[in-house]
UniProtKB/Swiss-Prot annotation:
HAMAP family (UniProt xref): THF_DHG_CYH (MF_01576)
UniProt binding sites for NADP(+): 166-168, 195, 236
E.C. numbers: 1.5.1.5, 3.5.4.9
Organism: Chlorobium phaeobacteroides (strain DSM 266 / SMG 266 / 2430)
A Pfam family annotated for this UniProt entry: THF_DHG_CYH
Protein name: Bifunctional protein FolD
Listed GO CC annotations: cytosol
Assembly description: Homodimer.
Reactions performed catalytically: (6R)-5,10-methylene-5,6,7,8-tetrahydrofolate + NADP(+) = (6R)-5,10-methenyltetrahydrofolate + NADPH; (6R)-5,10-methenyltetrahydrofolate + H2O = (6R)-10-formyltetrahydrofolate + H(+)
Length: 295
């Protein structure tokens, strides 16, 4: 059984991006710029934003964080986005989720210039993904990170049966569309399971590649997995654990110990898919920089 080490691959990728950023700094005197907007003071969101800013700094990319109070009107946020759309030094715009209830998340997504939508959530980018124009869009960072892991670990995908458990707009839907594309690291037959699927194990047991992204701790158990399957665990769930200092620990959507005994390869939680998400955000921002500057 092979452990797919997202921590290592994300660091490898960041090192590669750092080299590219240094090259552009030396050759044209410019570097990519990412701006993150956070509305309110959600502790988890603040941690995510700090991690993104730290990763930008690590590779020499310019990073700006705009903090807005929890009661910010929607129009104020939209105006800030419109200004960033016009700023030539900003190549990536990300609005940290979740947003306060007075703000329509879809309206915010629509306001971001698709050419700077490095989260890959704008309908134009999703539409290009569905149509197979991956060279003209941004792919959502978590699915893109999973694709990078499969590629770098030389996981055979062509003609394989990929089962995606979960249908969120952030992971499940773009992941399923990505895995059916005609790419070296995809080209699968794809099945999507969700909360209304009857007899989910009957589908997961057919999977050559099983991607769990439903947000339920240890939902996928050994009796739901085909021996030799590649298992990608997207879930991050807190469960109580009195033996730890914090009183909890992180587990995925997969019962790791039981499934690892059967799988040919598996991502751990933490240290699997999670680290790849920020790395792919940086990669998307660099790609935006290249496109905007015709590089």
């Amino acid at each position: 059984m092979q452990i797919i080490d997202g921590k290592k691959i994300s660091q490898d990728l960041k090192n590669e991006l750092k080299t590219d950023v240094a090259h552009f700094q030396a050759s044209i005197g410019k570097v990519p710029g990412l701006t993150v907007i956070i509305v309110g003071h959600d502790p988890a969101s603040q941690v995510y934003v700090r991690n993104k800013a730290k990763s930008c700094l690590e590779i020499g990319m310019h990073s700006t964080v705009i903090e807005m109070p929890h009661d910010t009107p929607q129009e104020t946020l939209l105006q800030a986005i419109r200004e960033l759309n016009q700023d030539p030094a900003v190549h990536g715009i990300l609005v940290q989720q979740p947003l306060p209830k007075q703000i329509d998340e879809f309206a915010v997504t629509l306001a971001i210039d698709p050419s700077k939508d490095v989260d890959g959530f704008h309908p134009e980018n999703l539409g290009r993904l569905v149509m197979g124009h991956l060279d003209k869009c941004f792919v959502s960072c978590t699915p893109y990170g999973i694709l990078e892991l499969l590629d770098r670990y030389n996981i055979e995908t062509k003609g394989k049966h990929c089962v995606v458990v979960g249908r969120s707009n952030i992971v499940g839907k773009p992941m399923a569309n990505l895995m059916m594309q005609k790419l070296d690291a995809t080209n699968c037959t794809v099945t999507v399971c969700h909360s209304a699927t009857r007899d989910i194990p009957s589908f997961t047991k057919q999977a050559d590649i099983l991607i769990a992204a439903l947000g339920k701790a240890r939902f996928i158990t050994a009796d739901m997995v085909k021996p030799g399957a590649v298992v990608i665990d997207v879930g991050i769930n807190r469960i109580e654990d009195p033996s730890t200092k914090s009183g909890y620990r992180l587990v995925g959507d997969v019962d790791y110990d039981g499934v690892a005994a059967l799988a040919s390869a598996i991502t751990p939680v933490p240290g699997g898919v999670g680290p790849m998400t920020i790395a792919m955000l940086l990669k998307n921002t660099l790609q935006s920089f290249r496109r905007i500057n015709n590089l």
